């Protein structure tokens, strides 16, 4: 099969990591190429021997896509361009996209009610033209009840389960003068309202021996810094920039926090579990479905419960990490994910013949 991937850019982000892991697993069996729209400082695909080509206008993409059997896109602009090539330019191929978010919730937390409705409806309309839609969970399948059932496939995300931990570039306990008996918690996120980082900050006090490091950037970062100042937690909560390779940071934590209000999947849950770090998530439906036996949870409507859960995770770290890691290997490896995607590709390819 000849398979093309169309993405917004080559920067490191959740959707691109998913495509990277599919390519890693399947590139030796199929002819593949990655098409991207925007330049970026980093290139998440540089570790795979697959050609990548920048696309600057739809007509260019049309000419390229004529060579392929399957087109797999990710993101609103790539989705729109692929549909344009399929419907307007009559490119004869099968098209598939992965829906990584709860579109109206995700857009609402970033852009407000009006824009979330406008862009959400537009994006959902675009999806109707795809031959297949990959949904990341049963919960998301119910959320997108209005999309045709025959087009939807549920595939859980997965990550490479090989050991890839880099040498420590920074000792975070030493950097921030965190005592040995302090509990070091952390999060990695694009700092938007839906990530729920503020819930953790509002729960912590100076009396707790819990220290919290937030790695990431985003539109909410300034507000979160101000919240830390207002609560006088500058000796408990610290911010560091987005990390291209977060494994070293995660490996130094006692517990990883994922306090999201809304989430499409949560790849960092898998990354932390792979490293043997216990994970605590909010009790939103998507996490309860995916990670019910693989994470601890706290009540998002009563965030004060988080303190007790963090303390429990620290005391039982060894047992929890072993238990959670075994479940990760059983459910969420990239090889399992890629096999399911390949089955979808094969079914579509048979329709092309």
UniProtKB/Swiss-Prot annotation:
It is found in: Membrane. Its EC number is 2.4.1.-. It comes from the Bacteria. GO terms for biological process: Gram-negative-bacterium-type cell outer membrane assembly; lipopolysaccharide biosynthetic process; O antigen biosynthetic process. Pathway: Bacterial outer membrane biogenesis; LPS O-antigen biosynthesis. The keyword Metal-binding does not apply. Its main location: membrane. Involved in the assembly of the O-repeating unit during O-antigen biosynthesis. N-acetylglucosamine transferase accountable for the alpha-D-GlcNAc-1,4-beta-D-Gal linkage within the O-antigen. According to PubMed:32421169, the hydrophopic domain of this protein is likely to play a role in stabilizing the association of it with peripheral membrane or possibly, with the hydrophobic moiety of the acceptor substrate. However, a transmembrane domain is predicted by a program. This is O-antigen biosynthesis glycosyltransferase WclY. It comes from Escherichia coli. The gene is wclY.
């Amino acid at each position: 099969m000849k398979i093309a991937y169309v993405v917004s850019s080559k920067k490191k982000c959740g959707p691109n990591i998913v495509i990277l892991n599919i390519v890693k697993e399947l590139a030796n069996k199929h002819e593949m190429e990655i098409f991207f729209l925007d330049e970026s400082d980093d290139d998440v695909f540089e570790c795979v021997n697959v050609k990548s080509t920048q696309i600057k206008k739809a007509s260019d993409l049309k000419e390229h896509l004529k060579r392929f059997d399957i087109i797999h896109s990710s993101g609103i602009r790539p989705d729109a361009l692929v549909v344009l090539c399929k419907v307007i330019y009559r490119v004869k191929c099968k098209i598939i996209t992965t829906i990584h978010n709860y579109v109206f919730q995700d857009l609402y937390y970033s852009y407000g009610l009006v824009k979330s409705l406008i862009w959400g409806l537009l994006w959902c309309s675009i999806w109707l033209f795809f031959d297949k839609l990959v949904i990341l969970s049963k919960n998301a399948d119910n959320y997108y009840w209005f999309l045709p059932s025959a087009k939807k496939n549920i595939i859980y995300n997965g990550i490479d389960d090989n050991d890839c931990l880099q040498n420590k570039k920074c000792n975070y306990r030493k950097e921030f003068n965190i005592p040995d008996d302090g509990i070091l918690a952390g999060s990695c996120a694009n700092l938007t309202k839906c990530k729920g980082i503020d819930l953790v900050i509002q729960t912590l006090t100076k009396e707790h021996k819990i220290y919290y490091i937030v790695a990431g950037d985003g539109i909410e970062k300034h507000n979160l810094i101000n919240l830390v100042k207002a609560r006088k937690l500058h000796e408990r909560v610290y911010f560091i920039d987005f990390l291209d390779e977060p494994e070293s940071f995660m490996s130094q934590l006692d517990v990883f926090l994922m306090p999201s209000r809304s989430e499409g999947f949560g790849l960092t849950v898998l990354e932390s579990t792979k490293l043997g770090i216990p994970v605590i998530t909010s009790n939103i439906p998507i996490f309860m479905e995916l990670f019910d036996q693989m994470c601890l949870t706290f009540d998002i409507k009563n965030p004060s419960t988080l303190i007790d859960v963090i303390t429990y995770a620290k005391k039982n770290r060894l047992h929890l990490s072993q238990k959670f890691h075994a479940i990760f290997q059983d459910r969420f490896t990239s090889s399992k994910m890629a096999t399911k995607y390949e089955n979808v590709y094969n079914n579509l390819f048979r329709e092309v013949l």
